[in-house]
A protein has these predicted regions:
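N-terminal segments that cap or nucleate solenoid repeat domains
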Residues: 2-42
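Glycine-rich hexapeptide-repeat left-handed beta-helix
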Residues: 1-17, 51, 57-59, 65-68, ...
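Short proline/glycine- and basic residue-enriched helix-capping loop/turn segments at helix->loop/beta transitions
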Residues: 85
Length: 174
C-alpha cells in the first residue's frame, strides 16, 4: 500500500486529497498538501512531498517511476495541468507544467520554471530556475534550450495517448 500521510505545518494539519480513481503504486509516497485529480496515476518509487508547500496534480496525469516532486518553503509550489506526463526519474522542484505537456525521462525542472501547454521537455534536460517554456515548444539539453516548435494537435494527441496507456496500465493492478 502506498504511503499517504498527513503532516502538521504552521499549526495546520495537511492531508493529501486524492480522487477516488487515482492509481497509487504500492511504494509511492504522497505526503502533506498534495491534491491529485481524477484518472491520474503515481507509479513505483515516485515521491510527492507536499510537506513544505503545495503540490497540485490535474486530471489524467501520470507521474512515472522514480520521479520526485518537491517545493520550496514559502516560495515555490508545483501545479501540473491535465494530461501531463512526467517520465521516469524526473525531478520537479517548485515548477509549473501546463496541460498536455510531456516531461521526458530523467529531466529536472527547477524552482520558478514554467512549461507551457503542449510543450515537451526532452529526456535528461535541465530546465534552470525561472525558465519560461512557451506553449508547444520543445526544449532539451543541459542547460535546456529551445529546439523547435511543435504542432498543438501533435502534442495534445501524444499526451492523450500516453494518459490513456497509463490508465490502461493502472487497470492491470486492480
Amino acid at each position: 500500500m502506498a504511503l499517504v500521510r498527513s503532516i502538521q505545518r504552521d499549526g495546520l494539519t495537511l492531508t493529501p486529497q486524492i480522487a477516488s480513481d487515482v492509481f497509487l503504486a504500492e511504494n509511492a509516497t504522497v505526503v502533506g498538501e498534495v491534491s491529485i485529480g481524477e484518472g491520474s496515476s503515481v507509479w513505483f518509487n515516485a515521491v510527492l512531498r507536499g510537506d513544505v508547500n503545495t503540490i497540485t496534480i490535474g486530471k489524467h496525469c501520470n507521474i512515472q517511476d522514480g520521479s520526485v516532486l518537491h517545493t520550496l518553503y514559502q516560495k515555490s509550489t508545483i501545479t501540473l495541468g491535465d494530461y501531463v506526463s512526467v517520465g521516469h526519474n524526473v525531478t520537479i522542484h517548485g515548477a509549473d507544467v501546463d496541460d498536455y505537456a510531456l516531461i521526458g525521462m530523467g529531466a529536472t525542472l527547477l524552482d520558478g520554471a514554467h512549461v507551457g501547454k503542449g510543450a515537451i521537455v526532452a529526456a535528461g534536460a535541465l530546465v534552470l530556475k525561472g525558465t519560461q517554456i512557451g506553449d508547444c515548444e520543445i526544449w532539451g539539453g543541459v542547460p535546456a534550450k529551445f529546439i523547435k516548435r511543435a504542432e498543438p494537435e501533435q502534442t495534445a494527441e501524444i499526451n492523450r495517448k500516453i494518459a490513456h496507456n497509463y490508465a490502461m496500465y493502472a487497470s492491470w493492478y486492480n
